[in-house]
Amino acid sequence: WEYESGLSRFGTPMAPMLLPYFTDQCLGSMEGLYFEASSTTPFHFINQSELSPNPSSAQRDLPYPGFDMDAGIRHLQLMGVKYYLAASPQAIEAARANPDLTELASTGPFSTPAGEDRDWTVFEVADADPVVPIENLPVVLTPEDDHIDGWVYGERPEATEEAPNPPKPSGPAIDWYLDPVRWDTPLATSGPDEWPRIDRESAMQAPSVPAPDPDIEISDYTETNESISFTVSEPGTPVLVKTSYFPNWQASGAEGPYRVSPNFMVVVPTENEVTLTYGRSMVEWLGLVMTILGIVLTVMLGRGDQRRMDAEAALSATP
């Protein structure tokens, strides 16, 4: 959705995050309540900059491109975002001129605190499938680094007297995201041995190695809060799943998932039926076990103290 400061008339300019609540989960919000916890956030704010004449540009140290409806819609297609909500006359006019958008409905006008009229207009984005086969094999960057400062950002320059807090340069994932020519060859932080490798300093010169069969069909896509499943016509071709990568995702019927640019997942189906499930990591299981042991130990110590106090009370009561 288009960002504008006038949304504060609802109490906060982030009010559209409640779209899932008001639409009975029919529509989601790309910008969520816990967006600080996701490495997909920087890419969202780049989209917001392209799709909002007056964006918030909330994440620092990003090369914001400015309002560009065509570039913004290409990014929504890349990220599998199906709808775009425009409010300002400038954004609505640009959206109506974009051939990849279909106007669905509008409501309003509403008055902003500045006395301006606003219509909310919803557009459907074409070619925004949530799961797609990839044309070329992902290229694994070496040395492997999953940290946001090696993926989204580059190394921060040394501070100087003139620049005590210099901005971070963009990392390989951001550079890739802003160059549509490279989108057919995702960058990866890890992957099978047959995927090509390249030094991360040369990421933008990554080779294009064709995938085994990029024309496979994907069907029966189903998504819940904790699982994603789909069917492929032929196993073996890497498939891009346009959902934020996190180590808790586990694949059944496929190898992976592997983290790829911008911050999505690729799996390599070994069967026709593929399921991704969001479970617990080893660190979480360890933390859970330690928590249970801590509770048990606390109860045991408490009971021991109670028995000691009871024994002392009995001794003091003996004539």
Short names for language-model regions:
Residues W1-L78, L137-D213, Y245-P247:
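Extracytoplasmic/lumenal acceptor-recognition loop(s) of multi-pass membrane glycoenzymes
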Residues W1-Y3, A86-P89:
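Structural motif
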Residues P16, D70-H75, P109-S111, I216-I218, ...:
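Generic recognition of flexible, low-complexity loop/linker segments
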Residues L27-S29, Y83-A86:
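Structural recognition of the beta-strand scaffold that forms the well-ordered cores
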Residues A87-A91, S244-P247:
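Short, polar loop motifs at secondary-structure junctions
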Residues A91-V125:
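Short acidic, glycine/proline-enriched helix-loop-strand junctions
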Residues P130-V132:
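Solvent-exposed loop/turn and edge beta-strand elements of beta-rich ligand-binding domains
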Residues T185, T189-P319:
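Active-site-proximal, structured, solvent-exposed surfaces of multi-pass membrane proteins
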